[in-house]
Amino acid sequence: MIAPIFAELAKTVGADKDGLPTLVAK
C-alpha cells in the first residue's frame, strides 16, 4: 500500500529510486 504512495510522491517531485531515500531523509 505504501509502495504506490511513495512512487506517486517520487513522481510528483520528479525523483527516481535515488530520489526516494532523499525524500524520506527530508
UniProtKB/Swiss-Prot annotation:
Keyword set includes ATP-binding: no
**Which keywords does this chain's UniProt record carry?**
Cytoplasm, Electron transport, Redox-active center, Transport
A single cellular component GO annotation:
cytoplasm
Q: What is its main location?
A: cytoplasm
> Would I find Cell division among this entry's keywords?
no
Query: Where located?
Result: Cytoplasm
Q: What does this protein do?
A: Participates in various redox reactions through the reversible oxidation of the active center dithiol to a disulfide. The H form is known to activate a number of cytosolic enzymes.
Family membership noted in the UniProt record: Belongs to the thioredoxin family. Plant H-type subfamily.
Q: Protein name, please?
A: Thioredoxin H-type
Query: Which species does this protein come from?
Result: Populus euphratica
